[in-house]
Amino acid sequence: LLRELNQNILLPSCQQFVKDYLDTICHLYSDEEVWYRFSELTNAEANSLDGTKEYFDERHPLFGYRGIRRLLACPDEFQAETNVVTEVFQTNLNLSVIFPFVNDAEQLKQAITVLRQYDFTGKVGTMIELPSAYFDLDRILETGISKIIVGMNDLTSFVFATVRNSQWHDMESPIMLDMLRQMQDKARMKKIDFAVAGYLNTSFIQKMNQMGIECILH
């Protein structure tokens, strides 16, 4: 949404746009859960938005101040976005939120604490996009979350140290499928919803269907 507007969430016009959008979606799907992912911009994208006040100098687009890292580093932006979802939640109890680009359980707990301080009482979930989050999954599952979504494009990139569309970016490899099975089993034991998301091809989707894993397509 912020990319589409080319505006930082600090701007009132951006806040109103996101609020109206979420209100509309929550009303259209009033009988279903609606999951809103907090802003997940690369540093270059965030630096170029109208209204951005915090600028970070980074050379690699995939690393650094993305997702939850930027939220915690820029509390004004975090508060502004949280205020929007909290306001929408008051009249749309089917709204839930999910944190992207999470390092580990400790970082996730920090973000959830801030979220609760601003009176959001709905469900919370997390993306698993980093190997560090995969290795810390046991503790992540104890943070009170209700949903896990594995970001397949980023996780595969970081596991194989490659970029999407390269010959080494193979999300159907036995390594990635084993990781998914392990995460699925752990989430199931804790009764936490589990899904995968990304730019997914037909072959991968078929494998997920066979494993009983929900797919969210970009």
Each language-model region and where it sits:
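Conserved alpha/beta-domain cores
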Residues: L1-H218
